[in-house]
Amino acid sequence: LELGVERLILGSAAVKNPELVKEACAKYPGHIAVGIDAKNGDVAIEGWGEGSGVAATELAKKMADYGVATIIFTDISRDGMLSGVNSEATAALARACGVPIIASGGVASLDDIRNVKKYEKDGVAGCIIGKAIYTGAVNLPDALKIAAAKEE
């Protein structure tokens, strides 16, 4: 971070070594994000290979208490499936912890981006688009226009 990196994202460390996250937040306030990958509300770790037995909501609240700037929430069941973003679960997580959440997993169309945008007031700060861009299902300039649009 001393070299100018804007944000550091920690993943499994949030479950396996939460003190590391706490220390990083104290040393670099506003620059630490946590990735929470979950299926049916249970946080997965080690590249989704293991369940943790930790509820996503509880982990998000703990990370908020530590001072993380952002949480990237991946609904594992939707990632790469082009099946739509789990906007409701993402918004519920944002409301529960009070930290801006970036949705990850499931974007299939511009309508998904519009849907995520509806939850800005709940604390959903944006979404990650992967496969939908590679397949051409989402045009990046159009997606950026939707993301930049002011709420009506």
Question: Model-derived features: where do they sit?
Answer:
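Conserved anion-binding
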Residues: 1-79
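Short, well-ordered secondary-structure micro-motifs
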Residues: 20-22, 44-47, 82-85, 113-115, ...
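C-terminal helical cap(s) of enzyme catalytic domains, especially alpha/beta-barrels
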Residues: 1, 21-27, 117-127, 133-152
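Short, small-residue-enriched loops and turns at beta-alpha junctions
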Residues: 42, 78-83, 109, 135
